[in-house]
Design a protein with these regions (language model features):
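Phosphate-binding glycine-rich loop
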Residues: 1-36
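Short, intrinsically disordered, charge-balanced linker/junction segments flanking boundaries
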Residues: 1-6, 79, 106, 168-174
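Hydrophobic residues at beta-strand termini and immediately following loops
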Residues: 16, 61, 150
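Substrate-binding/gating loop at the entrance of the active-site cleft, primarily
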Residues: 17-21, 25-28, 38-56
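A short helix->loop->beta-strand "cap" motif at the edges of active sites that frequently abuts
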Residues: 35, 56, 114-118, 143-145
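Active-site phosphate-binding strand-loop segment of PLP-dependent enzymes
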Residues: 59, 63-131
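Conserved core segment of the aminotransferase class I/II
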Residues: 140-174
Length: 174
């Protein structure tokens, strides 16, 4: 409701022991040995290390300050994504604190649909660093068919150590 996204709590939300559990389970569910995973650079190291642990190849995509830490879509479009299964994004972004704009989410959804891959937005800082409108990638038209969003109450509700999170996606992904 905070993000204006309609989800069926019986089949489109998965409670988690923190969002890191969601990172693990999502990667295990979608990535096989030899696949590729697009990871933001800079970005959360777990996306890369977990991909390597599973025998997948992490492929960095650049986030630069001159672009407001948003993906360079020309660079993404030029990539061979035939072996890519997941694209990780993390907005509000850590370590920079940058927020995604609606256009970034729209372009990520379009990219995922055309390339037949899944975008995972790791969104645990949404209520800490998101001044103004709270954005969810799942609020974008068509996103529920190709996107997953993780969130964590531990950070947003000042509950460190409680490990309370959730995964939101279409019922098939959940």
């Amino acid at each position: 409701r905070w993000f204006g996204v309609q989800l069926d709590p019986t089949c489109e939300i998965q409670p988690l022991i923190g969002s890191k559990e969601g990172i693990l389970h999502t990667t295990l569910a979608f990535v096989d040995h030899g696949d590729q995973v697009l990871v933001p650079d800079p970005g959360y190291p777990t996306y890369t290390s977990l991909s390597r642990l599973l025998g997948a190849q992490p492929v960095p995509y650049n986030l630069r300050p001159e672009r407001g830490w948003q993906p360079d879509f020309d660079e993404l479009e030029a990539m061979d994504t035939s072996r890519v299964r997941l694209l990780w994004c993390n907005y509000p972004h850590m370590p920079t604190g940058a927020r995604a704009c609606r256009e970034t989410y729209e372009r990520l959804v379009d990219f995922a649909q055309r390339r037949n891959l899944v975008v995972v937005n790791d969104n645990p800082y949404s209520f800490i660093l998101n001044e103004g409108e709270h954005l969810s990638i799942l609020a974008i038209d068509g996103a529920k068919e190709c996107c997953i969003e993780l969130n964590s109450m531990s950070k947003s509700h000042n509950m460190p150590g409680w490990r309370v999170g959730m995964l939101a996606a279409n019922a098939e992904f959940v």
